[in-house]
C-alpha cells in the first residue's frame, strides 16, 4: 500500500469546530515534506470525539487536497464489529484508499475473536485494511501468530501497524507475517521504534512525529531503503529528542502544542483531552528550536 512514512495526522479545531483552513495548511506541509500516505482520524486525529458528519467532511477534504498524490487511509476502528463495518462503508463510499482498524478495546476479545473481527469486515468490503495493534491503549495484543494467520487468510488485509513497542514481538511479527505472505506489510506504530523495525525487515512507520517533521521522517525511511543504513541511523538519533518530547503527555496533546507553536493549528483539543502544560510547552519550544523547526 505504501512504504515509508504515513502521517497519523491531527484534526485541527477552532472554537469547538473543525478548522479545515488549518487542516489544508497541514496537509500541504505533509505533501511538501514527502510523506507516503496520510492516516486520517486515528488516535492522533482524536477520532473518538469526531462525529459522523465531521468525519465525512474531514475525509472528503483530505481527498480533495491530496488529489490522488498519495494514499488516504481512514481510521475506522471501534469496539463493535458492526459499528466498525459502518465506518468502513462510509470510508469506502467517500473514496478512501484504505482503512486502519484498531483492535476492539475494553471488551478484550481473545485471539480467535480478533481474527473473526477482521475476517468479518474483510469479507464485506473491497477496501484495503490495516490492522492496528496498540495494546497499551486497547488492553489487547495481536500476537505474531494471529497476525500471520490474518496475513495468510485475509487477502485485503494488507498490513499491520505494530505499536506494541516490544522489539522481540516486532521481529516475530515481521518474520511470521512475511513468511505467511510476502507482500504483507508491517509499519511501526511507535516513532522511536521505526529504525529497529526497518532493520527487522519492516516497511516504514505510521508516524506522529511526521506531523511536525515530515521531511526528516521521510528521509529516515528513504535513506534506509536506499541502503544508506548509517545515514538513516544518524537521522534517527537526531530525531530522538523530538520523538521523546512529543510523548511526554498523552498523544496528541504534545504534537498539537508543537504544531501550534509552528503556526499550523490552534492548540485546541476536545475533552477529555486538555492542552499541554506550560512545562511541556517550554520543553517543546526548546526541542523544536534545536531541531530547526522553530
UniProtKB/Swiss-Prot annotation:
Q: Where is this site: Part of a proton relay during catalysis?
A: 43, 106
Report if keyword Zinc-finger is assigned. Answer: no
User: EC no.?
Assistant: 4.3.3.7
**What PROSITE patterns does its record include?**
DHDPS_1 (PS00665), DHDPS_2 (PS00666)
- Positions with a binding annotation for pyruvate: 44, 206
Show the catalytic activity.
Answer: L-aspartate 4-semialdehyde + pyruvate = (2S,4S)-4-hydroxy-2,3,4,5-tetrahydrodipicolinate + H2O + H(+)
Family annotation (Gene3D superfamilies): Aldolase class I
In the record, biological process GO terms are: diaminopimelate biosynthetic process; lysine biosynthetic process via diaminopimelate
Q: Does the keyword Metal-binding apply?
A: no
Molecular function GO terms recorded: 4-hydroxy-tetrahydrodipicolinate synthase activity
Chief place of localization:
cytoplasm
Keyword annotations for this protein, in alphabetical order, are: Amino-acid biosynthesis, Cytoplasm, Diaminopimelate biosynthesis, Lyase, Lysine biosynthesis, Schiff base
Compartment annotation? Cytoplasm
The pathway it acts in is:
Amino-acid biosynthesis; L-lysine biosynthesis via DAP pathway; (S)-tetrahydrodipicolinate from L-aspartate: step 3/4
InterPro entries noted in UniProt: Aldolase_TIM, DapA, DapA-like, Schiff_base-form_aldolases_AS, Schiff_base-form_aldolases_CS
Q: Which residues form the signal peptide?
A: none
Listed under subunit, the entry gives: Homotetramer; dimer of dimers.
Q: Which HAMAP family match?
A: DapA (MF_00418)
Assigned protein family:
Belongs to the DapA family.
Q: What is this protein called?
A: 4-hydroxy-tetrahydrodipicolinate synthase
Amino acid at each position: 500500500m505504501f512504504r515509508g512514512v504515513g502521517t497519523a495526522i491531527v484534526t485541527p479545531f477552532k472554537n469547538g469546530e473543525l478548522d479545515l483552513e488549518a487542516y489544508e495548511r497541514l496537509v500541504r506541509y505533509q505533501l511538501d515534506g514527502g510523506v507516503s500516505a496520510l492516516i486520517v482520524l486515528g488516535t492522533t486525529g482524536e477520532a473518538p470525539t469526531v462525529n459522523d458528519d465531521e468525519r465525512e467532511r474531514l475525509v472528503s477534504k483530505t481527498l480533495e487536497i491530496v488529489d490522488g498524490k498519495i494514499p488516504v487511509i481512514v481510521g475506522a476502528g471501534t469496539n463493535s464489529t458492526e459499528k466498525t463495518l459502518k465506518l468502513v462503508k462510509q470510508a469506502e463510499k467517500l473514496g478512501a484508499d484504505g482503512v486502519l482498524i484498531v483492535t476492539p478495546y475494553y471488551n478484550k476479545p481473545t485471539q480467535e475473536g480478533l481474527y473473526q473481527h477482521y475476517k468479518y469486515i474483510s469479507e464485506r468490503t473491497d477496501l484495503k485494511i490495516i490492522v492496528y495493534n496498540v495494546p497499551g491503549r486497547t488492553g489487547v495484543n495481536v500476537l505474531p501468530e494471529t497476525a500471520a494467520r490474518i496475513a495468510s487468510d485475509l487477502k485485503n488485509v494488507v498490513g499491520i501497524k505494530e505499536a506494541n513497542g516490544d522489539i522481540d514481538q516486532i521481529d516475530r511479527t515481521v518474520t511470521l507475517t512475511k513468511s505467511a505472505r510476502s507482500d504483507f506489510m508491517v509499519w511501526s506504530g511507535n516513532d522511536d521504534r521505526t529504525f529497529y523495525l526497518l532493520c527487522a525487515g519492516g516497511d516504514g512507520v505510521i508516524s506522529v512525529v511526521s506531523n511536525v517533521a515530515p521531511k526528516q521522517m521521510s528521509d529516515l525511511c528513504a535513506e534506509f531503503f536506499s541502503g544508506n543504513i548509517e545515514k538513516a541511523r544518524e537521522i534517527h538519533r537526531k530525531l530522538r529528542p523530538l520523538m521523546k518530547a512529543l510523548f511526554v503527555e498523552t498523544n496528541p496533546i504534545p504534537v498539537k502544542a508543537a504544531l501550534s507553536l509552528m503556526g499550523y493549528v490552534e492548540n485546541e483539543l476536545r475533552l477529555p483531552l486538555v492542552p499541554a502544560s506550560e512545562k511541556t510547552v517550554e520543553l517543546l519550544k526548546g526541542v523544536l528550536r534545536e531541531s530547526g523547526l522553530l
